[in-house]
């Protein structure tokens, strides 16, 4: 498993072509340096490259606000699937990773468990293939479901102060 000692750091990239491997070290370096346990590649820090549709940006902002409200952590690109983790974070996720809305729920769970979560600027491209799980006519329903999942997660995860779970 990725949580074994063989793999000290892990990288996740979506398979839809949005994530440019040229930015891999921007995402990995803060984990290598011990700054973060999980570093997320964010398209919204520099606001360059593909920024996604207006409605999706509104939804991402909403979820970002929910996460900040529920755990006090500010993350701009809460739906980014471009992330790096260290061994401790990966071991935690091996036991506690959400399957419904993994990107935003993982941020909330990691933050509540006392892990250091941060972002690094990347430039993303438009989706090269596949279909988004968020469709325009289902966006409101999706936002309600994710918001409720985050609230339920917050109620079920005990916040760790000054340490890791």
Question: Model regions: which residues?
Answer:
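Acceptor/aglycone-binding surface of glycosyltransferases and processive sugar-polymer synthases
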Residues: 1-4, 9-11, 21-100, 127-146, ...
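The conserved acidic donor/metal-binding loop of glycosyltransferases
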Residues: 14-18
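Catalytic donor-sugar/metal-binding loop of nucleotide-sugar-dependent glycosyltransferases
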Residues: 74, 95-98, 108-125
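Cell-envelope/extracellular polymer assembly enzymes that use nucleotide-activated donors
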Residues: 105
